[in-house]
Amino acid sequence: MIKPRTPPGIMELLPREQIAFQRMLDVIRRNYERFGFLPVETPVFELSDVLLTKSGGETERQVYFVQSTGALANAAAAADEGAESGGLPELALRFDLTVPLARYVAEHEHELSFPFRRYQMQRVYRGERAQRGRFREFYQCDIDVIGKDALSIRYDAEVLAVIHAVFAELGIGDFKVQLNNRKLLRGFFESLGVAEGELQLAVLREVDKIDKRGAEYVRDTLTGEGFGIATAQVDKILAFVAVRSNGHADALAQLQALEASVGASATLGEGIAELREVLELVKALGVPETAYCLNFSIARGLDYYTGTVYETTLTDHPQIGSICSGGRYENLASHYTKSKLPGVGISIGLTRLFWQLREAGLIAGIAESSVHAMVALMDESRLDDALDIARRLRIGGINTEVQMEPKKVGKQFQYAARAGIRFVVLAGDDELARGVVAVKDLVREQQFDVARDELASTLQVELEQAKAMLVSGIAAN
C-alpha cells in the first residue's frame, strides 16, 4: 500500500482553513474590482522559449518543465538511437504572473484598451529548496496598470490606495506601506560618484538587504573586494537609506531636506518630484497618513523597476517581512513587441502570507464554516420534511446541510459543532404540530422557536448582525 503524502513545498489546507484562505482571496478580488481592475487568467504552462526569454540564472534553475508521456517516449527512443537532445521541453510552468502578463499584453495589444487595468489571482510554481515557509506552489494576487507609450505617475498613488483598501478590509492588524523611488536612489548614488549602471544595480540589490541582513553586513559588503567603495561614501549611503518619515508633512519635509543637501541632479530631481506628487495624491485618495511612510532603503531587488517602489509590512509582526510589494517599470513587454508599454503594479504572495499569519495565530478568528445551518434528522419518517426545510433555507440564501440519516440529537449537535456550523434546525412532532421549527444557536448557546415561513429571514438577520459585529471589530482595531 502506498503511503499518502504531498510533495514538499505545498500548502494543503483542511476545510475550515481553506474557507479562511478563500475569504482572503475574496477580499482581495473585491477590492481589486472596486478600483476598476479587470480579471485575466493565463495558462498554467507557457511555451518555454516565450516564458524564459528574459530569465536565465536562478530563475531558470527553478522552472518546472512539462512533458507528455508521448514526448518522453519519443525523447527516450531518440536517445537510444544516438540522436542529440532537442534542448528544453516545449512547455514550462509559469514561475510568476509578470512574464505571462507581458506575453498576454503583447499578443492582444490591438484588442485591449489602454491604460489596461488587470488583476490576476492564480498559482505559480518554482522549484524552491524545500524548507519551512518556502513554497513550490503558491498563489500570487497581482494588479497592474499598463500604458501605451506613457503612463501618468498618478496611477502610482492609486496603486498605493488599493494596497491600503485590501489590507484594511483583511483586518489582520496595523500595516505600513513603505514608499521609495529608484530614481531617488540612482540620483543619490550619482552624487557620490557611483554612476556606472551595473554597479548601481549591484549596490541597489545590497541596499535592499538592509532590513534582513543589517547595516553592518551591507557596509562590509560595499567596502569589500567585490565593490571597493570608499568607507566615507558607504557611510553616506547608509545614512541616506536610514531615512524614514513619520506622517505626511514629515515625508514632504524629508524630500525638501534631501533636495537642499544633495542638490537636484536630473535623476534625483525626477525622483523627488514623482514622490511628492504620489504623496499629495495619496492624501487626496483618503489614505490615512499612518498607513504609509517614506523608506529610502526600499529598492526592490528586481532590475526592471525604474521609479516608485512599494513594500508593505505588518506593524506588530515585522518578522513576517513584506506582505505586498511592487513598483513602476518602463517597458513591460520589450522582448515581445516594439511598442513601449510602461506600467505600475503590485503582487500579494497570498500562500506565504496565509502561512505566516497562521503561524502567528492570526487566522483562527476568521476560520469559520461556509455552512450556516444544518437540518437535523431525528426520525426516518421526517426525511421529506427535513429536505423541504433545507430547500426553503437555500432559496432564502442560507447555506444549508441536511443530515441524511437519523442519529441521536447529541451526536448531530456534536457533528455541527466540530464542522463549525452555527445553527442546527430541529423539526419534531411537537414543532410540526405548532407550525414552527426549533433552532439551536451553537455560538450563543441558545435555542428558540421560529415559524417555518420566517426561518430563512430570521437566520439571515442573525448572520448579518454577526457580520456587522465582525466588521465593527475590525474597524475598531
Swiss-Prot record:
Molecular function via GO: ATP binding; histidine-tRNA ligase activity
Any one Gene Ontology cellular component term annotated for this protein: cytoplasm
Database matches in InterPro entries: aa-tRNA-synth_II (IPR006195), aa-tRNA-synth_II/BPL/LPL (IPR045864), Anticodon-bd (IPR004154), Anticodon-bd_dom_sf (IPR036621), His-tRNA-ligase (IPR015807), HisRS-like_core (IPR041715), HisRS/HisZ (IPR004516), HisRS_anticodon (IPR033656)
Compartments reported by the entry: Cytoplasm
GO biological process: histidyl-tRNA aminoacylation
Record-linked CDD domains: HisRS-like_core (cd00773), HisRS_anticodon (cd00859)
NADP is among the record's keywords: no
Stated name of the protein: Histidine--tRNA ligase
Organism per entry: Xanthomonas campestris pv. campestris (strain 8004)
